[in-house]
Amino acid sequence: MNTTILRKSVLGIAGLAVAGGIAAGPLHLTDTPTVDTRPVAVVQADKPAVDKAKLIPHGVQGEQSRIDLNDEQTGNVKAIIAATKKAGMDERAAVVSIATSLQESKLENLGHLGDRNDHDSQGLFQQRPSSGWGTVEQITDPEYATLAFLKGLKQVDGWQDMPLTRAAQTVQVSAYPDHYAQWEQQAADLVAEHWNS
């Protein structure tokens, strides 16, 4: 074998190795790598807060009641809020609607309860087909029932400036007109929680 070719090959390979080492840098670091442990600010786009003064403009009246809600009841809260928005009404209308439904059905979409039922009242608002609220299918549809209630509420002059129980009673014509007031705080809390969700 030609020694000149062998020498050129060895020198070429050595040259490549040196050049590669310079270009690639050292393969072994003598310093331990560090991790930046400084706190990082996380910015979350929060939903706009609901104006609490708008929810209960007159303050709550009387002792307040509260119940724990299951998933179905929470779904009905969200349906009432969605229908309120669809009707072009504000958070206060949602508070009145939810408090009314809390009193009438505990936010349960009730069917006919037989002997325990108040006449033919059904749905979230215990509306009656015989009183012109709609068919059984309509009044047991949360969106329809809420829109029907809100249609009645819109017809009450100055409802926004009334105590909740008076506004609800004017629409519902209940035998227990003062019972709506006990649900105002929970209704306001639910609207504050779900209005922007």
Model segments located where?
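N-terminal export and membrane-targeting signals
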Residues: 1-17
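Hydrophobic alpha-helical membrane-insertion segments, chiefly the h-region
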Residues: 19-27
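N-terminal low-complexity, Pro/Thr-rich disordered segments
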Residues: 26-69, 197
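Peptidoglycan-targeting cell-wall enzymes and recognition modules
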Residues: 55, 59-67, 105-163
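Export/targeting segments at the very N-terminus of extracytoplasmic proteins
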Residues: 56-102, 106, 194
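Surface-exposed patches in mature extracellular/periplasmic domains of secreted proteins
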Residues: 87-98, 109-114, 158-168
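Soluble periplasmic/extracytoplasmic beta-strand elements of cell-envelope proteins
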Residues: 97-99, 124-128, 170-172
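Catalytic and binding regions of secreted/periplasmic enzymes and modules that target cell-wall glycans
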Residues: 139, 144-197
